[in-house]
Amino acid sequence: GLQLATGEFIAFADHDDLLPSNALYECVRAINKHPKIRAIYTDEDKISMDGKKHFQPHFKPDFNRDLLNSTNYFCHLFVVDKRVVDKVGGLNPEYDGAQDYDFVLRCSEVTRNIYHIPKILYHWRAHMDSTAENPESKMYAFEAGARAIAAHYKRIGIDNAEVTQTECLGVYRTHYKIEEPLVSIIIPNKDHTDDL
């Protein structure tokens, strides 16, 4: 597993997907240019099984905490400093199907030095059994994603959040249970009743 990795950074990719020839170069270039970087994610697209057709490009925004709490927009390609990995631990099988989302959330809890490379540096192979082509094939992954977000909230001290799946698979909504305490307003106006 991850404990066997000896490099300074670890890149996460699925075994059947494709990296363009410049993907790792661009990641190293970003790390050299911005030495405080602790995690990197890139833009991505989907690719046909024969590798001839590229489609559904996903041009991502720079790091956005609220968006990350709503969907795993990091997804592919994700590169993270080994020290961050050692701090947060590896992939948690409790979130099978969304263990990458849980991992990204845990990484984002220990570093804000997250960098977006605005280039398509990952080609997600779309086949009928993958969530790339058939999201309904792995509904358990979306349920695990909701649990991963709820666990993230608990770790950062937000106990009043309820996470639900939206109509769009892989997109979640957080409902915060807000108390309605009694509010008192004190207006210091002794001897100035006309001002009221």
Report residues per predicted region.
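Conserved active-site beta-strand element of glycosyltransferases/polysaccharide synthases
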Residues: 39, 48, 79-80, 97-98, ...
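N-proximal low-complexity "stem/linker" segments adjacent to membrane-targeting elements
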Residues: 150-195
